[in-house]
Amino acid sequence: MKYWKYLSQLTIRRPLTYNNALLYRNRFPSILTWKRSATTQPDDTIFKDPVMDEQVQKLEEKMSSLVVNDPELAQKVGRLRQFFEKYGLEAGSKPSPLTILKITRDPEFKQLAETITEIFKKSGIQNDPAFLELVRRNLKKEK
């Protein structure tokens, strides 16, 4: 038990490595705001490239206007959202590989995904391989 008492002193004396960096960082209160992470305005860009951000923004606007104007698509997207909630998935959370495998094997998901893809194709939104490759490369650069 005495070891825990001296843990903070040990992390100060030892050189800072990745393993004890978390211990060092957690010594400070969580209400402390670091200057390098504080911003004056939110960052709404996905990529640092303005051309890519503009293309992605146009695609998002086109897809959202299609969902708003097409009641059938809005119903399918709502069913897809309920389907994901059934598996315990929430927006912003990363699912486990096992959950992804279960979802992709479900016939209801396959049917919903095919229907939504067909509606997007009819409206002119397609999976352009060149654009998807560009998005993939830009996402790799960010990591």
Curated annotation (Swiss-Prot):
Subcellular location: Mitochondrion
Keywords: Mitochondrion, Transit peptide
Boundaries of the annotated transit peptide in chain numbering: 1-38
GO cellular component, one term: mitochondrion
Top-level division of the source organism's lineage: Eukaryota
Protein name, as recorded: Uncharacterized protein PB1A10.16, mitochondrial
The species this protein was found in: Schizosaccharomyces pombe (strain 972 / ATCC 24843)
Taxonomic path: Eukaryota, Fungi, Dikarya, Ascomycota, Taphrinomycotina
